[in-house]
C-alpha cells in the first residue's frame, strides 16, 4: 500500500507572511515561500469519475477543480502531462460537495450560496451540503442545512419533490445499488430510508407526487451521537446488503453502525476511532479471498466487501467483512479532520480530502484488500433484489453522447406513436401496432430494408434459434385479434349475410386509453397513506371511525301507517327484551303484568373486570324526528388522546412500541365509571375523571357528572364531548375556557387542528369553533346535502346513506368530508354551501388521475416561517380526497362498471372528444378546488397543467379567458379577478393585495 501526497495537489491559498507589517496576496513564488507560509483552503469533498480518469475536489476557495488520476498515481513521471484538467468557479461561497453522475455525463456541486450547479460533458465542446446520484442517473438528491431532502430529475434537472421529514441538518446521503432505496443521515440523530421508483425522462413534479416514500426511520444507533460532526456521510455496500452509517455510538465509544437491509437493524459496530467518524465509503467492487490463478468457475472464493472510515481523529481505517479488526489504520494523515473519501471504480485506489487542504491518494497492491471480482458478480448479487438499473455503469464519452442522441430520436418516434394511440389517433395506432413492423425496446422501428424474417434468421446460431428469435416468431396478439374481427360474418333473420363493422379504436393499443391501469396500480402499492411525515393540512384522526365508515340512515318525508295498539305493544316488548339480551340497561321491564318501569339493579359485589365498552349511548329524543341519523359511539370505560412533542396525535403508550413511547409527550385520559351505583339510585354514579399526563406525572385533573364519548386536543386546548350533547373545553393548564356548549344530539365525531374544533352530532349537524377568538366562521351546517338526501327524501322507508370515512378540519377551519361512495366534499364559508372536490367520474374518465397511492402533500421551500405557514394552508387535501376516491371505487367494484360505460361511450358517434373534454374538465375542477381551499402549491401545479393542456388542444377562447383572469386589464372588474390569483400565487402579499383593491 502506498500513500501518495503530491505537492501540487491542493487548492492553493494566500500567502501569510510572519512579519505583521506586510502581507502578500499575489502568486506564490519560491522566494516568498522562504519568508512566510502558505495556508491552503479547506477541501470539503472529492469524487472519482466512473471511468477512473478524473478526480474532482471542492474547497473553501469556491473552485471546483478536476485532476488527472494518472498524474496523481505517476508523480515520479517527469513528462509534462496535464495535472489539473479544469477549474470552475460558479459559486460565491464555500463548496461542500461534488459528485459525478454514474453515467459520467454530469457533475454536480453545492455550496453555501444555496445554489446547485450542474456541469455537463458536451459532445462538441466550445473553445449544497451533500448530493447523491441514483445508480441509473435518473435522479439527483440534494440535502442541506435546511433539513429538507430535495429530489431533482437527472434528465431535465427539474425539482420533482421536496421531502420535509428531518428535524435538523441533513449531512449525508447514499443510494442503494439495486436502485430501490436511498438513505439520508441527519443531526436529528436518525437515518431515514426512502423507497423510490426511477422516474421517466419526461416526468414532472405532478407525476412524482406519489413517489419517494419514507420506508423506515432508524434512530437506535445514534441516540447519544455528538452533534459536532461536520458530515454524516454514509455508504451502501456494493452487494446491497448493508449500510455503513457514520457518527454512531456504542455506549460511550464512537463507532460506525452496520445496518442490515430489509429488517433495518444491526448488531455490528466498527469501533476504533477516537473521535466521531464523519465519512464512510464502501469500495464499489466485491473482492475474492483467493488469487485469480486459484479461482475456478465453480469456486471463486469467498466474496467480501471493503469499507474505509475516517473522521475527526485525522486517521483512516480500512475494514474487510471477514476480519473483526481493521486491516489498516493510518493516523495523522492531515492536520484537520478528513472530510470525504472516494474509491476508484476498479477498487485499487482510495482518495481522501481534509479540512487543512490535504488531498491524498492511497494505492493498493494486488492482494492488499483481496482480489477484485468482475462487475458481473456485483450484478449477480443484486438480482435477488429485483434490480432496475437502467443505464447504470455506462460511462459517457463524446461518441456515446452522439449515440444517445440517435437513440432519443428513435424513442421520441415511439412515444409519438403511443401517444397517438392513447389519444384515439387511429392512423398512428394502426401504424405502430397493426402493420408488420414491431417496435424495438426504445420505441424505434426496425431499419428499412430489413424484414422480420431476416431478423429472425440473423438470430440463429449453429442451427439453434435463440430466445430473441423465438420471441420474434410469436404472433402479435393484437394483430391476431384484429384479423379475427375483420371478417366476422353475421346473419339476419332473413338469411342475409352481413360483415360486422370494425371500430379501429377498439383494437390494439386503443384499449389502453381507458384508465384501468391507473386504478389498478393504486391497489398494488403497499404504501402507508397519511403518515405523520406526510404534509397534509388536515387534522390527524386518533380515534378511528368504524370499518367501512360511520353509518348513516336517511328517512323520507312520508310516514308509515299507524299500527294497531296490540301490535305496537308487542313490538315494544320484543324491542325491550332484545335490548336486555344485548346488555343494554332496560328502561322498561317486561313483566307478566306488562311493561313496567325497571327497578334499580343492586350493586355488584367483588372485583369486577373493567369492560372495553360499558353500554350503548342513550340517544337524544330529537333523533326520532330527524331525517338523518348517524351511528353513535358506545360508552367506553377509557378514552385516551396522546400527542407527541410537536403536537401531532400518536398512539397511546399502552398500545405502542417502546420506540413510540419515547415520542409521547402528553396523554389526555377520560375514565367513565361503571354502571353500578354507589347509593343504589341510578342517578348516583361516580363522576367521570379527566386527567392530563406527561409521562407518569399528572399535570391537572377535572371531573364531569356526564358520561364522556369522545376527547380530542393538542398543544392549544383539550376538549371532551359528553353523552348528553355537551362539549367542554380546557386550556393547556386545565382552566375551563368556556361554559359547556350544548348540542341538539350526541357528538359522533370530534376533531381539532390548531385553534379549530370540528364537532359532528348524531343528526348530521357540523359545528366549527375557534377557541382562540371564541367564534365560529359560519352557522351549523347539515351533512344531508352530501349524503344524497335529495334522492331519498321521497321514500317511505329508511335507506342507507353513504358512510362517512373521513371528517376532518384544516388549519383555516374548513370542513373536509370523504364518503364511502368515493366522493369528497369541502364546505365553503363564503358561499355557504358544500363543494364536491372529487368523485369517481374523474377516476375513470380523466387522463390526469393519480396513478399510485402515497403521501399526499408537497411543499416548496420558503424563506420565512410565515410564508411556510401560508404555503401549508390546505396542502395535500385535493390529492387526499382523490386517493380516497380511488380506494373506495376499487373497493366496491364500481370501477369495472364505470369503465364499461366509458368504453361504450367511446364507440358511439359524437363522443370522439370525450376523454379530452373530461380531462380538461377535471383540471378545471382541480383548479377551482385549489383556489377555493387556498392551496397555493397545488394551484401552481394545476394551473401549469391546465395552461399546457388547453394550449395543446388549441382552445383559443379558454386561453384568452385564462390570461385575462390572470393578467388583468385597465378595468376594475378585471382587477378584482386578478387579485385572488395573485394572492394565491404569492405574487403580492396580503397587505399589498388589500391596497390594490382599495386603489
UniProtKB/Swiss-Prot annotation:
Subcellular localization: Nucleus
GO molecular function: nucleosome binding
Start-end of Polar residues biased regions: 439-468
The WD repeat ranges on this chain: 15-54, 69-108, 130-169, 172-211, 233-276, 279-339, 343-384
Main location: nucleus
Keywords, ordered alphabetically: Chromatin regulator, Nucleus, Repeat, Repressor, Transcription, Transcription regulation, WD repeat
GO CC terms of this entry: chromatin; HIR complex; nucleus
Annotated InterPro entries: CAF1B_HIR1_beta-prop (IPR055410), HIR1-like (IPR031120), HIRA-like_C (IPR011494), HIRA_B_motif (IPR019015), WD40/YVTN_repeat-like_dom_sf (IPR015943), WD40_repeat_dom_sf (IPR036322), WD40_rpt (IPR001680)
Disordered: annotated segments: 439-476
GO biological process, one term: chromatin remodeling
Task of the protein: Required for replication-independent chromatin assembly and for the periodic repression of histone gene transcription during the cell cycle.
Similarity annotation: Belongs to the WD repeat HIR1 family.
Protein name in UniProt: Protein hir1
Annotated source species: Aspergillus terreus (strain NIH 2624 / FGSC A1156)
Amino acid at each position: 500500500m502506498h500513500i501518495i501526497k503530491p505537492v501540487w495537489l491542493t487548492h492553493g491559498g494566500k500567502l501569510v507572511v510572519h512579519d505583521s507589517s506586510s502581507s502578500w496576496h499575489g502568486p506564490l513564488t519560491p522566494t516568498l515561500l522562504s519568508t512566510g507560509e502558505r495556508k491552503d483552503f479547506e477541501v470539503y469533498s472529492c469524487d472519482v469519475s466512473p471511468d477512473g480518469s478524473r478526480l474532482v475536489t471542492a474547497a473553501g476557495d469556491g473552485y471546483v477543480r478536476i485532476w488527472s488520476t494518472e498524474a496523481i498515481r505517476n508523480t515520479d513521471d517527469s513528462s509534462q502531462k496535464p495535472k489539473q484538467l479544469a477549474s470552475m468557479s460558479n459559486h460565491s461561497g464555500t463548496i461542500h460537495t461534488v459528485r459525478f453522475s454514474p453515467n459520467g455525463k454530469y457533475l454536480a456541486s453545492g455550496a453555501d450560496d444555496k445554489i446547485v450547479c450542474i456541469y455537463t460533458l458536451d459532445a462538441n465542446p466550445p473553445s449544497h451540503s451533500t448530493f447523491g446520484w441514483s445508480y441509473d442517473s435518473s435522479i439527483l438528491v440534494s440535502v442541506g442545512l435546511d433539513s429538507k431532502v430535495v429530489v431533482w430529475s437527472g434528465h431535465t434537472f427539474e425539482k420533482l419533490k421536496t421531502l420535509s421529514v428531518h428535524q435538523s441538518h441533513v449531512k449525508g446521503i447514499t443510494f442503494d445499488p439495486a436502485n430501490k432505496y436511498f438513505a439520508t443521515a441527519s443531526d436529528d440523530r436518525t437515518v431515514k430510508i426512502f423507497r423510490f421508483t426511477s422516474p421517466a425522462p419526461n416526468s414532472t413534479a405532478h407525476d412524482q407526487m406519489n413517489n419517494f416514500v419514507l420506508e423506515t426511520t432508524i434512530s437506535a444507533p445514534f441516540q447519544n451521537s455528538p452533534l459536532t460532526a461536520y458530515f454524516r456521510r454514509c455508504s451502501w455496500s456494493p452487494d446491497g446488503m448493508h449500510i455503513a452509517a457514520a457518527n454512531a455510538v456504542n455506549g460511550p465509544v464512537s463507532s460506525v453502525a452496520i445496518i442490515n437491509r430489509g429488517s433495518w437493524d444491526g448488531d455490528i459496530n466498527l469501533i476504533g476511532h477516537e473521535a466521531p467518524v464523519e465519512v464512510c465509503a464502501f469500495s464499489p467492487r466485491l473482492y475474492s479471498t483467493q488469487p485469480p490463478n486459484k479461482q475456478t468457475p465453480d469456486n471463486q472464493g469467498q466474496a467480501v466487501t471493503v469499507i474505509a472510515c475516517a473522521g475527526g481523529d485525522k486517521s483512516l481505517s480500512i475494514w474487510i467483512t471477514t476480519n473483526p479488526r481493521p486491516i489498516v489504520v493510518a493516523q495523522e494523515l492531515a492536520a484537520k479532520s478528513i472530510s470525504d473519501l472516494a474509491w476508484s471504480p476498479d477498487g485499487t485506489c482510495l482518495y481522501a480530502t481534509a479540512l487543512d487542504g490535504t488531498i491524498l491518494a492511497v494505492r493498493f497492491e494486488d492482494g492488499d484488500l483481496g482480489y477484485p471480482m468482475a462487475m458481473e458478480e456485483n450484478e449477480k448479487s443484486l438480482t435477488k433484489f429485483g434490480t432496475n438499473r437502467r443505464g447504470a455503469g455506462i460511462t459517457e464519452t463524446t461518441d456515446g453522447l452522439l449515440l444517445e442522441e440517435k437513440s432519443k430520436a428513435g424513442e421520441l418516434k415511439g412515444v409519438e406513436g403511443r401517444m397517438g394511440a392513447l389519444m384515439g389517433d387511429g392512423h398512428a395506432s394502426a401504424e405502430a401496432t397493426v402493420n408488420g413492423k414491431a417496435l424495438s425496446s426504445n420505441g424505434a422501428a426496425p431499419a428499412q430494408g430489413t424484414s422480420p424474417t431476416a431478423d429472425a434468421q440473423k438470430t440463429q446460431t449453429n442451427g439453434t434459434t435463440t430466445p430473441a428469435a423465438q420471441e420474434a416468431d410469436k404472433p402479435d396478439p393484437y394483430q391476431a385479434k384484429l384479423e379475427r374481427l375483420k371478417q366476422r360474418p353475421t346473419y339476419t333473420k332473413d338469411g342475409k349475410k352481413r360483415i360486422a363493422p370494425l371500430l379501429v379504436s377498439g383494437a390494439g393499443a386503443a384499449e389502453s386509453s381507458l384508465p384501468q391501469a391507473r386504478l389498478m396500480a393504486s391497489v398494488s402499492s403497499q404504501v402507508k397513506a397519511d403518515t405523520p411525515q406526510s404534509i397534509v393540512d388536515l387534522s390527524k384522526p386518533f380515534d378511528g371511525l368504524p370499518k367501512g365508515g360511520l353509518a348513516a340512515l336517511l328517512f323520507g318525508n312520508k310516514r308509515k301507517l299507524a299500527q294497531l295498539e296490540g301490535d305496537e305493544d308487542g313490538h315494544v316488548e320484543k324491542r325491550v327484551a332484545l335490548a336486555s339480551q344485548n346488555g343494554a340497561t332496560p328502561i322498561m321491564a317486561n313483566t307478566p303484568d306488562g311493561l313496567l318501569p325497571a327497578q334499580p339493579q343492586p350493586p355488584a359485589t367483588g372485583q369486577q373486570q373493567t369492560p372495553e365498552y360499558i353500554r350503548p349511548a342513550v340517544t337524544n329524543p330529537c333523533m326520532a324526528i330527524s331525517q338523518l341519523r348517524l351511528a353513535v359511539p358506545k360508552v367506553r370505560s377509557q378514552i385516551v388522546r396522546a400527542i407527541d412533542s410537536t403536537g401531532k396525535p400518536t398512539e397511546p403508550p399502552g398500545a405502542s412500541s417502546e420506540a413510540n413511547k419515547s415520542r409521547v409527550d402528553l396523554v389526555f385520559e377520560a375514565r367513565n365509571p361503571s354502571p353500578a351505583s354507589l347509593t343504589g339510585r341510578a342517578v348516583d354514579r361516580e363522576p367521570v375523571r379527566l386527567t392530563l399526563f406527561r409521562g407518569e406525572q399528572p399535570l391537572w385533573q377535572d371531573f364531569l357528572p356526564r358520561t364522556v364519548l369522545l376527547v380530542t386536543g393538542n398543544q392549544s386546548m383539550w376538549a371532551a364531548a359528553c353523552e348528553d350533547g355537551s362539549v367542554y373545553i380546557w386550556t393547556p393548564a386545565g382552566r375551563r375556557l368556556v361554559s359547556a356548549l350544548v348540542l341538539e344530539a350526541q357528538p359522533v365525531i370530534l376533531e381539532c387542528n390548531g385553534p379549530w374544533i370540528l364537532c359532528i352530532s348524531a343528526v348530521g349537524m357540523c359545528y366549527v369553533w375557534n377557541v382562540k377568538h371564541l367564534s365560529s366562521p359560519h352557522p351549523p351546517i347539515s351533512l344531508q346535502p352530501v349524503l344524497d338526501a335529495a334522492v331519498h327524501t321521497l321514500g317511505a322507508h329508511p335507506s342507507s346513506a353513504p358512510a362517512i370515512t373521513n371528517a376532518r378540519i384544516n388549519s383555516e377551519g374548513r370542513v373536509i368530508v370523504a364518503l364511502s361512495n368515493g366522493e369528497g366534499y369541502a364546505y365553503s364559508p363564503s358561499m355557504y354551501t358544500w363543494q364536491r372536490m372529487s368523485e369517481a367520474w374523474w377516476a375513470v374518465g380523466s387522463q390526469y388521475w393519480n396513478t399510485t397511492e402515497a403521501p399526499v402533500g408537497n411543499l416548496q421551500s420558503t424563506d420565512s416561517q410565515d410564508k411556510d405557514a401560508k404555503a401549508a394552508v390546505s396542502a395535500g387535501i385535493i390529492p387526499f380526497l382523490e386517493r380516497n376516491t380511488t380506494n373506495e371505487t376499487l373497493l366496491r367494484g364500481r370501477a369495472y362498471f364505470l369503465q364499461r360505460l366509458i368504453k361504450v361511450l367511446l364507440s358511439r358517434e359524437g363522443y370522439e372528444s370525450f376523454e379530452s373534454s373530461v380531462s380538461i374538465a377535471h383540471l378545471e375542477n382541480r383548479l377551482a378546488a385549489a383556489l377555493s381551499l387556498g392551496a397555493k402549491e397545488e394551484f401552481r401545479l394545476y394551473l401549469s397543467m391546465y395552461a399546457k393542456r388547453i394550449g395543446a388542444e388549441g382552445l383559443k377562447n379558454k386561453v384568452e379567458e385564462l390570461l385575462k383572469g390572470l393578467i388583468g386589464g385597465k378595468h376594475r372588474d378585471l382587477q378584482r379577478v386578478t387579485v385572488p390569483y395573485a394572492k394565491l400565487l404569492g405574487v403580492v402579499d396580503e397587505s399589498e393585495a388589500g391596497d390594490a383593491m382599495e386603489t
